[in-house]
């Protein structure tokens, strides 16, 4: 995401993740990393209720009115993220995040298979995300999403 932003491919960054508990905050880690690498807080928007990839894609369209996006995530996770965004009518491109190799990839692959099956069922059934809420404009201040 940082490289795409620095290259001018994206003017704003929507970070999305689980922040359902005070002691568990995926958003904080992502925001701090982006800030540390020179991204202005004014372009970092946060969705604190991205409890699943499905929730993140659904909320990106329903809450933040995203119509076009570049999704950056782990390569093994990218097909599901693209599917979820496309199911919401988002014109989407995907980029596999560069990163370290971690042990346990076999277990993550199994989890990914199960998650894909679940999310296809959610798309077909019209499942709502865990939380919806009022619209948030990506043309407004990013600080409105600080949570």
Give a label for each model feature.
Residues 127-147:
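Short linear elements at protein peripheries
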Residues 93, 115-122, 138-144:
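A general structural signal for short secondary-structure boundary/capping elements
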Residues 1-110:
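A structural signal for short, hydrophobic/glycine-enriched beta-strand patches
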Residues 109-131:
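A transmembrane-helix-recognition feature enriched in membrane-embedded lipid enzymes
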């Amino acid at each position: 995401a940082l490289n795409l932003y620095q290259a001018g491919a994206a003017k704003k960054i929507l970070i999305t993740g689980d922040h359902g508990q005070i002691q568990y905050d995926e958003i904080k880690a992502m925001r701090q990393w982006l800030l540390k690498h020179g991204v202005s807080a004014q372009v970092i928007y946060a969705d604190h209720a991205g409890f699943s990839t499905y929730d993140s894609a659904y909320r990106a369209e329903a809450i933040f009115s995203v119509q076009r996006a570049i999704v950056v995530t782990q390569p093994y996770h990218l097909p599901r993220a693209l599917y979820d965004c496309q199911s919401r009518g988002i014109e989407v491109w995907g980029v596999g995040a560069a990163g370290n190799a971690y042990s346990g990839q076999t277990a993550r692959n199994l989890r990914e298979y199960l998650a894909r099956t679940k999310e296809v069922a959610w798309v077909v059934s019209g499942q709502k995300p865990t939380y919806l809420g009022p619209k948030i404009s990506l043309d407004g201040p990013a600080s409105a999403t600080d949570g």
